[in-house]
Amino acid sequence: MARYIGPKHKLCRRVGRPLCGSAKCPALKRPYRPGQHGPGRPQKLSEYGAQLLEKQKLRFIYGVMERQFRRYFEQAQRSRGVTGEVLLQLLEQRLDTVVYRLGFARTMAAARQLVGHGHVTLNGRRVDIASCQVKPGDVVGLTQKARSLAVVRESLDLRRPVPPYLSLDETTMTSRLQRLPLREEIPVDVDESLVVELYAR
């Protein structure tokens, strides 16, 4: 599956906020577009510009390329429920996202790498596809080798709160997706209705 391999902090600065999960993200000090010599006078975005910005933010947060993102949107459109909320649920059901929410990795990119290197199991079977959809009732876990990895231990030591829709057994390092997340349980500062409006144009 294709992925963005360019400079991550450049994306953060493009949207004006840290999306990479790093505490040292340059966007915290310089929340303006890269290439500008200083913040300058803020420009008012057009309606299309605001919609595009929200879509790009969502794509960058989850590390999804445009073609795959559109597929998620089309799937959300076909599903019952509010399209924007269903879109977020589909993105939250990605295996790499679940691994990140469980605190097994510090960033979404690190979670994707953990999955890609075969350190994650789904219902007892090793899976190396980050975009694999986790369904309610599925059990996500770490391989025996992954449990002793320094990067995993360091991430778990941060003690990030686990969302209420996931149950984590710290003894076995496994988690069950109890249900689909509610909108207020998804910690993403994005107006998904603007994304829906963009694709409806």
Curated annotation (Swiss-Prot):
Keywords in alphabetical order: Ribonucleoprotein, Ribosomal protein, RNA-binding, rRNA-binding
UniProt domain S4 RNA-binding: residue ranges: 93-156
Single GO cellular component term: small ribosomal subunit
InterPro entries linked: Ribosomal_uS4 (IPR022801), Ribosomal_uS4_bac-type (IPR005709), Ribosomal_uS4_CS (IPR018079), Ribosomal_uS4_N (IPR001912), S4_RNA-bd (IPR002942), S4_RNA-bd_sf (IPR036986)
GO biological process entries: ribosomal small subunit biogenesis; translation
Record has Ribosomal protein as a keyword: yes
Gene3D superfamilies registered for this protein in UniProt: Ribosomal Protein S4 Delta 41, Chain A, domain 1 (1.10.1050.10), RNA-binding S4 domain (3.10.290.10)
Molecular function (Gene Ontology), one example: structural constituent of ribosome
Functional summary from the UniProt entry: One of the primary rRNA binding proteins, it binds directly to 16S rRNA where it nucleates assembly of the body of the 30S subunit.
Record-linked HAMAP family: Ribosomal_uS4_B
Membership in a protein family: Belongs to the universal ribosomal protein uS4 family.
Subunit-level organization: Part of the 30S ribosomal subunit. Contacts protein S5. The interaction surface between S4 and S5 is involved in control of translational fidelity.
Protein name: Small ribosomal subunit protein uS4B
Lineage, top ranks: Bacteria, Bacillati, Bacillota, Clostridia, Eubacteriales
Gene: rpsD2
